[in-house]
UniProtKB/Swiss-Prot annotation:
Presence of keyword Disulfide bond: no
Cited PANTHER family: 50S RIBOSOMAL PROTEIN L33, CHLOROPLASTIC, LARGE RIBOSOMAL SUBUNIT PROTEIN BL33A
Gene this chain is encoded by: rpmG
GO molecular function: structural constituent of ribosome
Name of this protein: Large ribosomal subunit protein bL33
Organism: Helicobacter acinonychis (strain Sheeba)
Length: 52
């Protein structure tokens, strides 16, 4: 089952990206190094749940 998730910047707390993931195969939370347009640099983005 695919679940909608958001990727939240660890510095500015802004949700910059949204994506889906398979909840059955990937049980751990995502942490990706992505570009934050507000900070204008690459930061760690952590997974949060989005309201459907």
């Amino acid at each position: 089952m695919k679940v909608k998730i958001g990727l939240k910047c660890s510095d500015c707390e802004d949700i910059n990206y949204s994506t889906t993931k398979n909840a059955k195969t990937n049980t751990e939370k995502l942490e990706l190094n992505k570009f934050c347009p507000r900070e204008n640099k690459h930061t760690i983005h952590k997974e949060i749940k989005l309201k459907s």
